[in-house]
Design a protein with these regions (language model features):
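Basic/polar N-terminal segments that are highly enriched at the extreme N-terminus
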Residues: 1-9, 14
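Short N-terminal binding/cap micro-motifs at the start of the first secondary-structure element
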Residues: 17-22, 48
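Cytochrome P450 core scaffold surrounding the K-helix E-X-X-R motif
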Residues: 49-55
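Short coil/loop residues immediately preceding or within conserved phosphate-binding loops
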Residues: 7, 72, 108
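NAD(P)H dinucleotide-binding glycine-rich loop of Rossmann-like/cofactor-binding domains
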Residues: 86, 97-124
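Extracytoplasmic/periplasmic beta-strand context in beta-sandwich domains
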Residues: 25, 91, 108-109
Length: 124
């Protein structure tokens, strides 16, 4: 595993109240845990569940605040946690991660993602 303890930029939500804006913040970037890969995020989609979480109307998925929301991503693997054999540093991937129930979301420069939730980007 490559240790990458540093900071990254992220959009952080501090309140579910209507009219509350996301805050551009520097947050800690921990190394990936076992079974995870760290992805440098190139693109993050807006999934319908993201909108519901932001509005505070998806109690089954809402993280404790402050939180980084976002569930979908595309990017490149920059570090690999213990026990991950199907990916390598430099692999282009897409998939989903966090943004729900305390898992960091994709509205950030990087995310530590469960490797089972990712796929390799097709060559074509």
């Amino acid at each position: 595993m490559t240790a990458l303890n540093r900071q990254m930029r992220a959009l952080v939500l501090d309140s579910y109240e209507e009219g509350t804006a996301f805050r551009d913040a520097l947050i800690n970037l921990p190394s990936p845990s076992a079974g995870q890969v760290q992805v440098k995020i190139f693109a993050s989609g807006v999934n319908p569940i993201d909108y519901k979480i932001r509005q505070g109307i998806a109690p089954y998925a809402m993280p404790e605040l402050p939180a980084v929301l976002g569930t979908d991503l595309a990017g490149e693997i920059v570090a690999i946690g213990d026990g991950v054999a199907d990916f390598a540093v430099g692999d282009a991937v897409y998939g989903l991660t966090g943004g729900v129930r305390g898992l960091q979301g994709t509205l950030a420069e990087y995310a530590n993602v469960d490797a089972e939730l990712l796929a390799l980007k097709p060559k074509n």
